[in-house]
């Protein structure tokens, strides 16, 4: 579920970062002066950032950001934009931060941006019908049929454990072929599976295995704003300790996703 960024865009932003002036106003000063945090987000990436039936912008990332703003004592203004230009917009100063399931795992991104304390974690899971009795551990998938995109990391995981791949285009098709018994299980992102189960309570799908190797998403700011980042991370830790992140996880995914 976590976002990708082109090498070209990263290179462009790296050049911009090298030209940043030391006299630049700090992010914390700017936020305090405005009394508002300006946030870049897609608004079309459910269940993280989307519009509900009433048209209100909501989602896990959106509500976490609102809670962080409350902790900081400022208002929040969301600016919806497409993903391809979002981090470039952050670098250009259109936003104070980005809330859009960004993991910031690559060295290229880490050289340009900083990420707060993680507010959710995700990793690979194995999902199959509740009635499945052959799978007790991941090694048990050997010889079973896995509904996977052939070129995905999850497809590679299925090959590693010697499953028979049933080609699909995405999660929706994976679930369909499992329901029609043309496949036995699928490897996929934990948040994607939890979102599906939450939205489809009558589904027969169940998580049988979950990877210990997880990636955390956080709020992203331009490089060099350590003071603001520290306050944002402190707010996220407080929200976790107070149970707010757990409550939001249960609201959007059916369980707490704020811990590994």
What does each of the following model-derived ranges do?
Residues 62, 66, 70, 75-140:
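Acidic, polar ligand-binding/catalytic clefts
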Residues 37-38, 73-75, 92-100, 144, ...:
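Alpha-to-beta junction loops
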Residues 120-125, 190, 194-237, 255-260:
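Periplasmic-binding protein-like
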Residues 63-71, 145, 150-153, 216-255:
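Extended ligand-binding regions for polar small-molecule ligands
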